[in-house]
Amino acid sequence: MAGTARHDREMAIQAKKKLTTATDPIERLRLQCLARGSAGIKGLGRVFRIMDDDNNRTLDFKEFMKGLNDYAVVMEKEEVEELFRRFDKDGNGTIDFNEFLLTLRPPMSRARKEVIMQAFRKLDKTGDGVITIEDLREVYNAKHHPKYQNGEWSEEQVFRKFLDNFDSPYDKDGLVTPEEFMNYYAGVSASIDTDVYFIIMMRTAWKL
């Protein structure tokens, strides 16, 4: 994925700069996540998923507040309350965190989403809806990796490092879901102005 690290750095710098003037709580939270790079929003999603003990995909205010604290998000309590109110659309005291993450994700055009899903489907060789090391063996030759060639990494490590790009730094399980893949590229997408350039980059990177 040539260029992604550079985009990541540029995006983090841009996000930090914008944070100094942003006043909308959703925008401020989005920028704080993007300031950590492409995986920032996905990482926050993982924190919330771990906290969702009963797997009902919802969070109450206390859980929401704790999740933001655990992820070291800097926000006033009033801001967090306003955020929560905006997501608690029916006023029942809980928010749906899938909806929350979707709103937090930087907006992307339909063309960008389509090319991201094309890449996901190409990588998901077994068609089970997640990308694993087994899938990568089919599409990616680890033996060409310089660290494999110099004996520093095993084949397994090369694949694992590759998946770690998309996996959250807070809970690396070696599985990449469509949601994680989309969240990662939403971060990359935020640093690329035109659809044309983004689509060319994706097609080149994944030989689509």
Swiss-Prot record:
Binding site for Ca(2+) 2: 88, 90, 92, 94, 99
Gene3D superfamilies, sorted: EF-hand
Main localization (coarse): cytoplasm
Start and end residues of each EF-hand domain: 39-74, 75-110, 111-146, 154-191
Molecular function as annotated in GO: calcium ion binding
Subcellular location: Cytoplasm
Superkingdom of origin organism: Eukaryota
Keywords: Calcium, Cytoplasm, Metal-binding, Repeat
SUPFAM superfamilies: EF-hand
Pfam families per record: EF-hand_7
Residues holding Ca(2+) 1: 52, 54, 56, 58, 63
GO cellular component: cytoplasm
UniProt cross-references to InterPro entries, sorted A to Z: Ca-bind_SignalingProt, EF-hand-dom_pair, EF_Hand_1_Ca_BS, EF_hand_dom
Protein name (record): Calcyphosin-like protein
Protein's organism: Homo sapiens
Lineage: Eukaryota, Metazoa, Chordata, Craniata, Vertebrata
